[in-house]
Structures are given as C-alpha cells and as structure tokens.
C-alpha cells in the first residue's frame, strides 16, 4: 500500500544560515544584468532590474511637511499633512548631489506601501511606520496629530522608514517601492492593480491557525514570545521615561522661582545686589534649558518606539509561518484520510465507523465496477494530494530559510541601534547633569563675590 504521509513537524526545517548585514543610511542597491531579474520567492513581484536609478547611490529624504485641505473618499472636506519626498543622486561628476525626483505623499500612502510589502514579502521583518497619533506623551507634549512638533517627529520617522526599506537587500528592489519614490500620479491605482488586498491573509484565518496548528516550530514560537516581551519592556520603558520627563520638567521650571526671588532680593540690597541678580539670571537659564533637553529626549524616545512597533512586524512573520504550517498539516491529514479510504475499498475492511459503512450494510455492497471506479478516483486524488503536499513542503522550507535569514539580519540591526540609542541617551543625561553643575558653580561664584 501507499506509504504514510510525512510528519508535518519535520517538514519546515531550514538548513544553517549566514546572517545578513544591517541597513545603512544611504540607498546603495546594485542590480545585476538586465535579464537577471526574477520574482521573489514565487510571490509574483517584479524586482527592480536593469534600471540605472538603482545602479547609483541615492539619498532619500522627507524634507518638508505641509498642512493641506481636500476631499476624502466620501466627498467630505478634511485636513491632512502631506510630506515632500526627495531623491538625489550623489554620484554626480562634480561631486554635488543632484535632485532626481520630488513628490508629495500622505501618511495613508505610506501605510498603503507598507501593507503591500507585508503581503508580498511575508518572510521579511518589514520596517514599521512612525505612530499616527502620539503615544506615551507627558503633560507638556501635545497629543494632537496636527501639532507642529509631532508632525516634525513623524516626518523624521517617515524618512527613517524609507531609508530602512531602501537599504533592505530585498525590499529595495521592489517595483512598487521605486514607483512610490518617482510616480506622483496614479500611484494608488498602480498598487491596487497588483491585487495585493486579495492575497492578504484574513485575521480570522491567522487566529484559527494559531490555535489549531498541532506542531508549531519552536523557534517561531519563541520568537513570538520574544516579540511580546520586547513590546512589553519597551512600553514600560517609555512610560517610565514619560513620568520622569513630567517630574523633571517641574523641577527645572521651579528653579525659575529662584531667579524671581533672587531678582526681588537684589532690589533691596546694596552690597549683595549684583551677586544676587547674577545668580538669579543663572537660575532663569537653568529653568529654560529643560525645553531643549526634553525635545532632544523625544528623539531617543522615537528610536525606542520604532522597535516597539517592530515587535508587531516580528509577529506578522510568525503568523504567516503558523498559517503555512497549518495548511501543511491539513494537507497531510487529507492525504492520510484518502489513503485510508482507498485501502478500505481495496481490502473491503472498514477500520473506523463511517456513514459509507452504514449505507453498505443497509443497501448492500457496491459492484466491483463501482469499487474500481472509486478506487481510481481516489488514486488520482492521492497523486494530486502528494504533489500538493510536496509543493507546500518546498514552499514552507523556502519561507523558513528566507524568514530566518531576515530575522538574523533584524537582530543585528536591533542590537546595534538600541545599543547606540541607549548610550547616546546616557551621554545626554550626563551632559544635562554637567550643565546643572555648571549653573550652580556659576551661582556659587556669584555668591562668593558678594
């Protein structure tokens, strides 16, 4: 008889992988010969090939934000922010950068681009977008998404998103990403023509696979748990930072009272007046310095927020793997059931209770011709099922191989970026404390001269 189907637990196992390098700040994607282009992992996405745009070093920047008013899909007036994307070639003959393209994009178009990338590159940890509305704010920080300071931080975040995509070894070659940077008119139509919405996995299907998969890959299970814990840790860190910022702001501003009191005191003193006046001035400078300090802190908070949102990108890769594993297990079960049914027809023995067995007892046995016809149909279905299982197995192996390579690349990037951000934050705190020491040292000298 036919051999038993392979164990789904052992199907999606990759070989040893070499980690890839992390992204840089400038797009540098070298594309091979004109006819080299293939479709990425059979997903049906044309990679960028034979285009001189990618053969040069390109600087990408989101240089400006502008508030605009227009009509939305239901013909209602709305206010939104548009962002100016500029791409420049930095390999000009005289060494100067040359503007090649500039166009305006809304935040919703950035979202559309990322959703497309998530569907067509499910094995990639797709870079996240900056927050659409402010989170983890302290009382002085506005939660309004039209606030100029928030819009500026989001502009920086959108530029960082484009640089992340442009420096990714796979995403940078995508045709839709290229058109996002260069095609101002009808870009949405170009994206929708790819039909990516139809290929997106439903949330219900993904949730079903999460709970019903029988043999999940332990590495992806651990990765999902890690992403949950990473998100939790960074969330708590950002909440602590917001509370500290609130209190620090109050402490610094209260020092302004020193300045006012010293100034009032200096008015009634003759010999001590100048010293008190100078000390009060130093206290005023100290009190006002907190605004710039906390503005700089927001930069480091945004770096942490990026990896807060990266946690969801990691989970998206895990969900896709669970879906593929669940489909593989379902195909293996269907194949095993058909083989058992074929064996029962061939031997005339029924190993388990079935409706067919009951009808046979009630209405009599099938004729040999009917049995042979059913066996033939089942054998054809078994052959198709084996081919389908083999195809799903190969697809799953390729997904695991590519996904794990990108996860290793992401880990290197994460370790490097977070290390740099935390060190820079510590240096900034040290600098802030030194400035405080300097203020009080100056005040001491003022008191000494009285």
Swiss-Prot record:
**Which Gene Ontology terms describe the biological processes this protein takes part in?**
endocytic recycling; positive regulation of autophagosome assembly; positive regulation of histamine secretion by mast cell; protein transport
Q: Which residues form the PX domain?
A: 61-187
Looking up Gene3D superfamilies in the UniProt record yields:
Arfaptin homology (AH) domain/BAR domain (1.20.1270.60), Phox-like domain (3.30.1520.10)
- Where on the chain is N-acetylmethionine found, per UniProt? 1
Which N-terminal residues, if any, form the signal peptide?
none
Q: Which CDD domains match?
A: BAR_SNX4 (cd07622), PX_SNX4 (cd06864)
Q: Which UniProt keywords apply?
A: Acetylation, Endosome, Lipid-binding, Membrane, Protein transport, Transport
Offer a single GO CC term for the protein. presynaptic endosome
Q: Does the keyword Cell inner membrane apply?
A: no
Q: What Pfam families does the annotation carry?
A: PX
Q: Where is this region: Disordered?
A: 1-46
**Record's InterPro entries?**
AH/BAR_dom_sf, PX_dom, PX_dom_sf, PX_SNX4, SNX4, SNX4_BAR
Give start-end positions of Low complexity composition bias.
11-20
According to its UniProt record, which protein family does this protein belong to?
Answer: Belongs to the sorting nexin family.
Function according to Swiss-Prot or TrEMBL: Involved in the regulation of endocytosis and in several stages of intracellular trafficking. Plays a role in recycling endocytosed transferrin receptor and prevent its degradation. Involved in autophagosome assembly by regulating trafficking and recycling of phospholipid scramblase ATG9A.
Q: What is known of its domains?
A: The PX domain binds phosphatidylinositol 3-phosphate which is necessary for peripheral membrane localization.
Self-association or partners: how does it assemble?
Heterodimer; heterodimerizes with SNX7 or SNX30. Interacts with WWC1/KIBRA. Identified in a complex with WWC1/KIBRA and dynein components DYNLL1 and DYNC1I2. Interacts with BIN1.
- Spell out the protein name for this chain: Sorting nexin-4
The gene name on file is Snx4
